[in-house]
UniProtKB/Swiss-Prot annotation:
Residues of the CARD domain: 8-99
Membrane topology per record: Single-pass membrane protein
Protein name from the UniProt record: Caspase recruitment domain-containing protein 19
Naturally occurring in which organism (per UniProt): Mus musculus (Mouse)
TM region positions: 122-142
Subunit structure: Associates with BCL10 by CARD-CARD interaction.
Gene designation: Card19
Length: 183
C-alpha cells in the first residue's frame, strides 16, 4: 500500500474543492488568514493579499492558492488541510482523498464521527414526538371514564403494545388491565 503525501491528496482534491458552491468566500478568506497569521506562517502578507483579492473570482483565487501550496511543498499542503479541517469540517470529511482505496487509514479514523451524528430529523422531531406522547397520556389520565366521551380509545390502546417497544408495553398493559375486563 502506498502512502499518499499531502501534495498528492491536494492534487486529487483540487477539482472537488474548486467545484461550484463547495467553499464560500468567507471560508476561503478564513483559510487564507489561518495560513497567513498563525504559526507556522505559510503565506506571506503579500501572498495573502493576492489570494484575498476581491476583484478576482473565488474559483480563480482558490485555484491559484492550491497550485501555490503544491509548489511550496508538503508542509504547506499539510497546513492547508489543517486549516480546511478547522474552518470547513463538513467539507473536509467528504474529500475524495479520504475515501480513496489507497488511503484506507482515513476510513478507520472516520467511523467515529459518523456514529455520533443525529438523524436527519433532528432534536425537534424527538421533542414533537415526546410532546405528543405526553399529551396523549395526559388526555387519558384526565379524561373521565365515561364511555360516551371516548368509546373506542381504550380498545385502540389495548392493541398499541404490539407496535410499541416491550418496555413501554408493560406499563401500558398494566394501566389498561382494569378496563379490559369490561370490554
Amino acid at each position: 500500500m502506498t502512502d499518499q503525501t499531502y501534495c498528492d491528496r491536494l492534487v486529487q482534491d483540487t477539482p472537488f474543492l474548486t467545484g461550484q458552491g463547495r467553499l464560500s468566500e468567507q471560508q476561503v478568506d478564513r483559510i487564507i488568514l489561518q495560513l497567513n497569521r498563525y504559526y507556522p506562517q505559510i503565506l506571506t502578507n503579500k501572498e495573502a493579499e493576492k489570494f484575498r483579492n476581491p476583484k478576482a473570482s473565488l474559483r480563480v483565487r482558490l485555484c491559484d492558492l492550491l497550485s501555490h501550496l503544491q509548489q511550496r511543498g508538503e508542509r504547506h499542503c499539510q497546513e492547508f488541510y489543517r486549516a480546511l479541517y478547522i474552518h470547513a469540517q463538513p467539507l473536509h470529511s467528504h474529500l475524495p482523498s479520504r475515501y480513496s482505496p489507497q488511503n484506507s487509514d482515513c476510513r478507520e479514523l472516520d467511523w467515529g464521527i459518523e456514529s455520533r451524528e443525529l438523524s436527519d430529523r433532528g432534536p425537534m422531531s424527538f421533542l414533537a414526538g415526546l410532546g405528543l406522547a405526553a399529551g396523549l397520556a395526559l388526555l387519558l389520565y384526565c379524561c373521565p371514564p365515561d364511555p360516551k366521551v371516548l368509546p373506542g380509545t381504550r380498545r385502540v390502546l389495548a392493541f398499541s403494545p404490539v407496535i410499541i417497544d416491550r418496555h413501554v408495553s408493560r406499563y401500558l398493559l398494566a394501566f389498561l388491565a382494569d378496563d379490559l375486563g369490561g370490554l
